[in-house]
Swiss-Prot record:
Pathway: Energy metabolism; oxidative phosphorylation. Keywords: Membrane, Mitochondrion, Mitochondrion inner membrane, Translocase. It is an enzyme of class 7 (translocase). The keyword Translocase applies. This is Cytochrome c oxidase subunit 7B-liver, mitochondrial. GO terms for cellular component: mitochondrial inner membrane. Its main location: mitochondrion. Component of the cytochrome c oxidase, the last enzyme in the mitochondrial electron transport chain which drives oxidative phosphorylation. The respiratory chain contains 3 multisubunit complexes succinate dehydrogenase (complex II, CII), ubiquinol-cytochrome c oxidoreductase (cytochrome b-c1 complex, complex III, CIII) and cytochrome c oxidase (complex IV, CIV), that cooperate to transfer electrons derived from NADH and succinate to molecular oxygen, creating an electrochemical gradient over the inner membrane that drives transmembrane transport and the ATP synthase. Component of the cytochrome c oxidase (complex IV, CIV), a multisubunit enzyme composed of 14 subunits. The complex is composed of a catalytic core of 3 subunits MT-CO1, MT-CO2 and MT-CO3, encoded in the mitochondrial DNA, and 11 supernumerary subunits COX4I, COX5A, COX5B, COX6A, COX6B, COX6C, COX7A, COX7B, COX7C, COX8 and NDUFA4, which are encoded in the nuclear genome. Belongs to the cytochrome c oxidase VIIb family.
């Protein structure tokens, strides 16, 4: 991932949805 913002949402967002 190039952008930190996108990585944050892509990784964090998915983690929250999966792991909560």
């Amino acid at each position: 991932s190039n952008t930190s913002h996108q990585d944050f949402h892509s990784f964090y967002g998915t983690n929250l949805m999966i792991g909560g």
